[in-house]
């Protein structure tokens, strides 16, 4: 029992020392108090003895001293380890902070598998796959760099779009927003004729360009002044804008594919910029070639009727402007003298007609008239002319051929009553294109009202 009592006493001493440590006293004070307590216990030990053993109490006291000395040694060793324990306690706040950060670290660990999957999906594709696509794009672009000689337009500087222009945008200009993307549609004014025009236009372009009905209508609007008057600068911007729309459509296709989206987003900016600009130039060159073909063949696509008498020169395979140039150069003493129309006098009125048949005598400047004069179908002249017919003076008619066709009004002129001659003007007064002050367009000279 006494042994248990001593153990309890020692534990109480240790507990009291820990309380003093918690209240801020230094470790030397703990040692001093413990030594005092030990001395007090050692001082009382000789007076203690067991009941009915009064004669042998000295031996018991010695035994108790030996036992307590061992216990005191254990306590001293424990006190020696107290500073280290205190250091551990001082480090506990830092450990607590580390524990607080553990949840975020756990979140990072949870995202590692997804990141690993992304890394596995992105390895060599940007450098290999997109580089191959870029090489193919540049090769195709070089093939489509310029229009074919057969479809290269002539004349008409007002609608000239360079076919050898290369467009390069900076990476900041390619912030492609796929919201609000609307495909093009056939214009309302073209719906009645679009099928015929689109079919023939597709044959002219071939499978290499393969235009759609909507694209045909879009190009048609650039030459149709009834819809929007335009110039070469406006048309160029429209073609560039439409090429960017095609690139946006390509990007939408990439975004819809999870596989390609990861590959595209993982590629470097320099590579993506090259791909985007190459796609832009490919689409732009395609639009320019379709634009050139439509400009050259526009009279035949839109206004060439089946009756050959309404086509200038009777040649359906070439543009009207080219045909007019050939006839005037080969059959007239003046290089650009139009021979496809004459002014005729019948009574008190003038009739502007298109000749379906011509006969030429020895004098190249004389044109024979048909036996039967055709009736005037419209108050609009097929060509604006300025001529002198005997003493009948016809004032110059200024007309501008817009891109939808010839649009001019013929103002009747009342001749002097004193003159009744019906003869044609002499060769010196032959009609010339310069006198008419006519602005030629590549579409040729035609009047939709005569069709």
From Swiss-Prot:
Bias kind Polar residues: ranges: 305-323
Keyword Cell wall biogenesis/degradation set for record: no
Cellular component terms (Gene Ontology): extracellular region; host cell nucleus
Chain intervals for the UniProt region annotation (Disordered): 303-336
Major location category of this protein: secreted
This protein's UniProt keywords: Host nucleus, Secreted, Signal, Virulence
Cellular location(s): Secreted; Host nucleus
The keyword tRNA-binding is assigned to this record: no
Motif position, RxLR-dEER: 48-65
UniProt signal peptide: 1-17
Free-text comment about domains: The RxLR-dEER motif acts to carry the protein into the host cell cytoplasm through binding to cell surface phosphatidylinositol-3-phosphate.
Function, in words: Secreted effector that completely suppresses the host cell death induced by cell death-inducing proteins.
Family: Belongs to the RxLR effector family.
Name of protein: Secreted RxLR effector protein 70
Organism name: Plasmopara viticola
């Amino acid at each position: 029992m006494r042994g248990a009592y001593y153990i309890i006493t020692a534990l109480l001493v240790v507990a009291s020392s820990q309380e003093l440590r918690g209240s801020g006293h230094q470790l030397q004070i703990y040692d001093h108090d413990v030594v005092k307590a030990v001395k007090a216990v050692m001082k009382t030990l000789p007076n203690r003895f067991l009941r009915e053993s009064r004669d042998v109490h000295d031996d018991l006291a010695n035994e108790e001293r030996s036992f307590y000395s061992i216990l005191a040694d254990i306590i001293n060793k424990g006190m020696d380890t107290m500073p280290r324990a205190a250091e551990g306690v001082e480090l506990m706040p830092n450990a607590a902070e580390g524990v607080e950060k553990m949840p975020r670290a756990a979140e990072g660990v949870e995202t590692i598998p997804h990141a690993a999957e992304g890394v596995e999906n992105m390895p060599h594709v940007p450098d290999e796959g997109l580089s191959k696509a870029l090489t193919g794009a540049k090769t195709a672009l070089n093939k489509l760099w310029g229009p074919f000689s057969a479809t290269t337009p002539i004349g008409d500087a007002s609608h000239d779009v360079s076919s050898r222009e290369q467009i390069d945008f900076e990476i900041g200009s390619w912030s492609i927003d796929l919201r609000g993307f609307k495909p093009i549609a056939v214009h309302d004014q073209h719906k009645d004729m679009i099928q015929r025009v689109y079919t023939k236009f597709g044959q002219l372009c071939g499978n290499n360009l393969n235009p759609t009905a909507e694209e045909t209508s879009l190009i048609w609007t650039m030459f149709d002044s009834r819809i929007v008057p335009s110039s070469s600068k406006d048309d160029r911007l429209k073609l560039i804008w439409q090429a960017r729309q095609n690139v946006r459509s390509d990007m939408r296709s990439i975004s819809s594919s999870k596989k390609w989206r990861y590959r595209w987003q993982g590629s470097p900016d320099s590579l993506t910029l090259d791909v985007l600009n190459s796609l832009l130039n490919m689409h732009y060159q395609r639009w320019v070639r379709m634009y050139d073909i439509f400009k050259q063949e526009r009279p035949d696509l839109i206004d060439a009727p089946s009756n050959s008498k309404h086509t200038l020169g009777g040649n359906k395979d070439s543009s009207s402007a080219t045909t007019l140039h050939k006839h005037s150069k080969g059959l007239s003493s003046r290089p650009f003298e139009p021979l496809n129309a004459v002014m005729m006098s019948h009574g008190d009125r003038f009739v502007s007609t298109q000749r379906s048949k011509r006969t030429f005598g020895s004098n190249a400047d004389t044109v024979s008239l048909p036996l039967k004069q055709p009736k005037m179908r419209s108050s609009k002249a097929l060509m604006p002319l300025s001529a002198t017919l005997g003493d009948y003076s016809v004032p110059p008619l200024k007309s501008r051929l817009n891109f939808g066709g010839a649009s001019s009004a013929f103002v009747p002129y009342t001749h002097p009553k004193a003159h009744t001659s019906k003869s044609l003007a002499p060769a010196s007064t032959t009609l010339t294109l310069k006198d008419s002050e006519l602005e030629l367009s590549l579409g040729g000279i035609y009047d939709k009202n005569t069709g």
